[in-house]
Amino acid sequence: MSYSLPDLSYAYNALEPFFDEETMRIHHTKHHQNYINNTNSILERTNFSSLSIEELMSIFNEISLENKNVLRNNAGGHINHSLFWKGLKIGTILQGDLKSEINKQFGSVEYFKSKFEDIALNHFGSGWIWLVNQNGILSIVSTINQDNPLMGKSISGTHGNPIFGLDLWEHAYYLKYQNRRLDYIKSFWNVVNWDEASRRLSK
């Protein structure tokens, strides 16, 4: 099995004016596709080629390959972006169990957003910031490069099932926001797909 670029459920301009059309098109068709091509090239003659990307992440710590770090960056890039695209949509509302858990565990939605923004802004260099479910505990964590919490703590420095994540690589925002990373981070709240986030919480 080889991985393929997932279709988006929306047009490239659907997240305007918060995420611009040109960035979305390049991000999806160029950057994500490149991660997939590299992952397929590494896995094509291995015993791991039949695994789904989620299965691959779950056993990543056990994989022994000469180019494991290259696979880590590229397979991580594939799953990170796959989660990212599905987690974006304008017009959804934070409600239900997810809203209750955020209020319960962070004190308020406003404090949760402020903490998420602060951790994202202070993440040095490229990476991702995540809201994850760690056995019923919601945590805000960051990972470097294309690491994913599903890789486990020994690989990514953290763990948990992602509820949603924000791409902090410059290619995700620089065409529109240049060096205004905080503006990009704050704009994210306008495009979070809370319906998908709630579904992931209930898994």
Curated annotation (Swiss-Prot):
What Enzyme Commission number does this protein have?
1.15.1.1
Give the UniProt entry's GO cellular component terms: cytoplasm
Its EC top class is oxidoreductase
Gene3D superfamilies, per the entry: Fe,Mn superoxide dismutase (SOD) domain, Iron/manganese superoxide dismutase, C-terminal domain
Q: Which UniProt keywords apply?
A: Manganese, Metal-binding, Oxidoreductase
Substrates-to-products reaction catalysed: 2 superoxide + 2 H(+) = H2O2 + O2
The cofactors it requires, by name, are: Mn(2+)
User: Which residues make up the binding site for Mn(2+)?
Assistant: 27, 81, 167, 171
Q: How is the cofactor bound?
A: Binds 1 Mn(2+) ion per subunit.
Name one molecular function that GO assigns to this entry: metal ion binding
Q: How does it assemble?
A: Homodimer.
By sequence similarity, the record places it as follows: Belongs to the iron/manganese superoxide dismutase family.
Described purpose of this protein according to its UniProt entry: Destroys superoxide anion radicals which are normally produced within the cells and which are toxic to biological systems.
Q: What is this protein called?
A: Superoxide dismutase [Mn]
Lineage in the entry? Answer: Bacteria, Pseudomonadati, Pseudomonadota, Gammaproteobacteria, Enterobacterales
Q: Gene symbol? A: sodA
